[in-house]
């Protein structure tokens, strides 16, 4: 096919779920890379990103890989969901996380 429409939410809040999962050439098809995208430069950058615990380096690797996949239009993103959250002013300590919208930090919340 030439084009398909889909949606997706990550399993956890880490660049891996956005970049490695969707753009590594060894994950083509159902494992994640559904556009069958392949670029050796991106593969190298993504492998470097998961091989370091230095957050500054990791950010640089992911940003460089992201620039390439955006420039090559591996996917065309149509929109990002916008959230509106109603909250009682008596609730304290709630932190909204758009990636985990149904997960609540109840140990830190109070009334």
Label the model's feature ranges.
Residues 20-51, 79-111:
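Short, solvent-exposed loop/beta-turn-alpha elements that line the ligand-binding surface or hinge
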Residues 4-7, 52-89:
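Bilobed periplasmic-binding protein-like "clamshell/Venus-flytrap" ligand-binding domains
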Residues 1-29, 61:
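Periplasmic binding protein-like
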Residues 13, 40, 69-71:
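Extracellular/periplasmic catalytic domains that process cell-envelope and extracellular macromolecules
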Residues 3-5, 17, 70, 103-106:
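Weak global preference for isoleucine
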């Amino acid at each position: 096919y030439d084009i398909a429409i889909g949606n997706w939410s990550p399993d956890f809040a880490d660049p891996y779920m956005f970049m490695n999962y969707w753009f590594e050439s060894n994950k083509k098809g159902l494992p994640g890379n559904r556009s069958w995208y392949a670029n050796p430069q991106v593969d190298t950058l993504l492998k470097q990103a998961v091989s370091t615990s230095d957050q500054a380096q990791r950010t640089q690797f992911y940003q460089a890989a992201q620039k390439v996949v955006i420039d090559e239009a591996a996917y065309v993103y149509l929109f990002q969901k916008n959230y509106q959250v109603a909250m009682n002013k008596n609730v304290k300590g709630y932190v909204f996380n758009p990636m985990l919208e149904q997960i609540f930090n109840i140990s830190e919340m109070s009334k």
